[in-house]
Swiss-Prot record:
Nucleotide-binding listed as a keyword: yes
A GO molecular function held by the record: glutamine synthetase activity
Presence of the UniProt keyword Ligase in the record: yes
Catalysed reactions, as listed in the record: L-glutamate + NH4(+) + ATP = L-glutamine + ADP + phosphate + H(+)
Pfam family name, one: Gln-synt_N
Subunit architecture: Homooctamer.
Biological process (GO), any one: glutamine biosynthetic process
Protein name: Glutamine synthetase
Occurrences of domain GS beta-grasp (ranges): 26-105
Source species, domain of life: Eukaryota
Known EC number: 6.3.1.2
Annotated gene: GLN1
Amino acid sequence: MSENSTIVSNTANLVKFLNLDQKGSILAEYIWIDGANGVRSKTKTLFKKPSSVEDLPEWNFDGSSTGQAPGEDSDIYLRPVAIFPDPFRMGDNILVLAECWNADGSPNKFNHRHECAKIMEAHKDQKPWFGLEQEYTLFDLYGNPYGWPKGGFPGPQGPYYCGVGTGKVYCRDIVEAHYKACLFAGIKISGINAEVLPSQWEFQVGPCVGIEMGDHLWISRYLLHRVAEEFGVKISFHPKPIPGDWNGSGLHTNVSTQAMRDEGGMKAIEEAIQKLSTRHAEHIAVYGDDNTLRLTGRHETGNIDAFSYGVADRGSSIRIPRSCAKEGKGYFEDRRPASNACPYQITGIMMETICGGI
């Protein structure tokens, strides 16, 4: 990995300091979503281990430096909403997911969690389960797909998906490290696999209930960026990272309610798909930036201008797994969301469409 990435953290030198006694202090890494749909974080020292988010103090940051506020009124407030164990500092140290709020007490315009949480609470009796398949691509420091020949291209797609062996997969060490970091942090990560495009991988998170889906997906993204730092590698969630005859990256969204999982649930699945067909444009609007480059009707995608569904059809907007069609119950997969989409917006509009607004 050193050939492609020359700037790597001196982790071995850091370890002896990580093992120093903190004298009872707790390091809390506050994490939030910025104005460019990325993650930011900063650290606060606590003098008592919190037992819940209610024990954590509200904090603030300069929103003019994150695209979330103008310079003349730049204070944005961080309200903790979830706690996770910290896999980097370990011990009693924690990761804190926080929502962003304006000084006037209103949610920041990039705080999509707030509205999502309200609709999840309104429809909690439906017992919604979600599972997200996060695809991403790894690049070196200079913007080249990791492991690709300098100034050239690897062989055509085919051997890379779930590949094994040198020349078929790249950066497995980063992927494995991220997997373990997620497990340590309590993320409901359910699997990993190499993807169709060389240097592209996927991890799955879920099933998660309601708002938990967005929380776990965002923290897993944060962990991926942090792990990649250690290796001097960049993570891209762009839905079409390489132009041409190469697969894009998606955030396939698996959805079910209790009615869909019960006997005869196929009727509820079909009713949900019918509702989704009437709001295709509204969903596409929040399903990620640059998705037009990915949803072309090629490379295992449907066309962005047309809604479609089918059993086991990866070229459709909505796929019903063959096993679910056979059993007459289960879940469906929305294949439209781009890899850079916000999970709160995806799951929020999904519940609004299939269960009703509030």
